[in-house]
């Protein structure tokens, strides 16, 4: 059953088109299995019967899909009570690790200035088999404005006051809105690492086209440039090409492991 706003400190938004009902149920089950009570908002096409059934079964509120992922997440947060202390979103195939919310809420409670708590993320294939663990640790925030984004989004938790202070997600981004958010939040307060795996990200071999990857990298570079001082922006050419190459290599390696696992 859902927690009431007075009971729940955590709001989690799940955005879905309803095309992967079996994964959506796993996502919702991983949230409901947490020790820390949370309320769930699903943003999806309202006519989708599988989404309606899942919302009823897992006690989630249902809101209409506004047409883009960042807009869906902003809607889920904006249309919810302001009493929640912490907020995040999950895609319809992400999973929270058992104890995830206990770790991240404890980290934010212990660090009142912190805006985000995050941990490591397990990459899994469509069958749930482990491909990779992304574990950058406490130095990930230090390279955020020039290096790769190594803070896994699915298991992180954002302090709601900080989310509202920076205005939520920038809907001009199609892919890099999470990086843009983290860069803004880092200016408000620290991003703290809990030191454990807190989520799983499901890797689909066909989830991003070559064009999507190029757009993602271009958006990431735009977000980073926006976060830098005018002087620092003049030197982005020093690191953008190496980071671009490293990003392509990492994606190819995960893709290779996914194909090997499936084969």
What do the predicted segments below correspond to?
Residues 95, 99-131:
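Conserved donor NDP-sugar-binding/catalytic core segment of glycosyltransferases
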Residues 64-82:
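Glycine-rich, basic loop-to-helix element that forms the pyrophosphate-binding segment
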Residues 87:
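Short aromatic/hydrophobic "clamp" motif used to bind/position activated sugar donors
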Residues 141-145, 201-204, 210-235:
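Catalytic core of nucleotide-sugar-dependent glycosyltransferases
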């Amino acid at each position: 059953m859902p927690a009431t706003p007075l009971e729940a400190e955590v709001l989690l938004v799940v955005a879905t088109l309803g095309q992967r009902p079996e994964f959506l149920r796993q996502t919702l089950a991983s949230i409901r299995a947490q020790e820390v009570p949370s309320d769930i908002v699903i943003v999806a096409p309202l006519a989708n019967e599988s989404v309606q059934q899942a919302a009823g079964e897992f006690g989630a509120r249902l809101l209409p899909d506004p047409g883009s992922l960042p807009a869906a997440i902003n809607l889920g947060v904006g249309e919810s009570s302001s009493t929640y202390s912490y907020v995040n979103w999950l895609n319809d195939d992400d999973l929270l690790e058992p104890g995830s919310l206990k770790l991240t809420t404890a980290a934010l409670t212990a660090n009142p200035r912190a805006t985000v708590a995050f941990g490591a993320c397990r990459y899994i294939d469509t069958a749930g088999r482990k491909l990779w663990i992304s574990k950058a640790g406490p130095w990930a925030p230090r390279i955020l404005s020039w290096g790769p984004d190594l803070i896994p989004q699915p298991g992180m938790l954002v302090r709601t006051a900080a989310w509202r202070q920076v205005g939520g997600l920038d809907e001009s981004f199609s892919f890099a809105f999470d990086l843009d958010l983290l860069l803004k939040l880092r200016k408000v307060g620290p991003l703290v690492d809990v030191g454990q795996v807190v989520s799983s990200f499901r890797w689909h071999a066909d989830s991003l086209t070559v064009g999507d990857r190029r757009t993602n990298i271009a958006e990431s570079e735009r977000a980073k440039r926006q976060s830098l001082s005018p002087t620092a922006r003049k030197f982005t050419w020093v690191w953008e090409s190496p980071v671009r190459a490293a990003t392509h290599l990492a994606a190819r390696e995960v893709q290779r492991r996914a194909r090997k696992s499936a084969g």
